[in-house]
Amino acid sequence: MYLIAAEAELNLNHKKEGAEYINEIRRRAGKEGHKKEMEISQDELTIDFILDERARELGGEQQRWFDLKRTDKLLERVQKYNPDAKSNIKDYHILRPIPQTQLDAVINKEEFKQNTGYSGN
């Protein structure tokens, strides 16, 4: 919840409050005797910082794609940090393919098509 609150505060341009939420997380997780060193200032709070903090805190919880899509950073960050995928990532990857079983199950198939860029559209 602190990461969500920090992002909301940043979006409201309340960087001081957003940084405090991040610092609360870091005080909880920091090594004794070094917690103060882990704190950030409001000037360091950016969406990229929050995304990096979310990756550290939520690694393995399968939230990364949603975070990058929601913040409109998916293409930028894949191109920057994943050299193997850099040449393959395309604008249409912002949407995922709709499972074929879902497309087969709809009654009015002419109204529901596969997302652009994936087979069947």
PLM regions: where:
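Extended, hydrophobic/aromatic-rich amphipathic alpha-helical segments that build helical scaffolds
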Residues: 1-25, 47-57
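Long, intrinsically disordered, low-complexity segments
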Residues: 26, 37-121
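Boundary/linker segments of alpha-helical solenoid repeat arrays
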Residues: 32-36
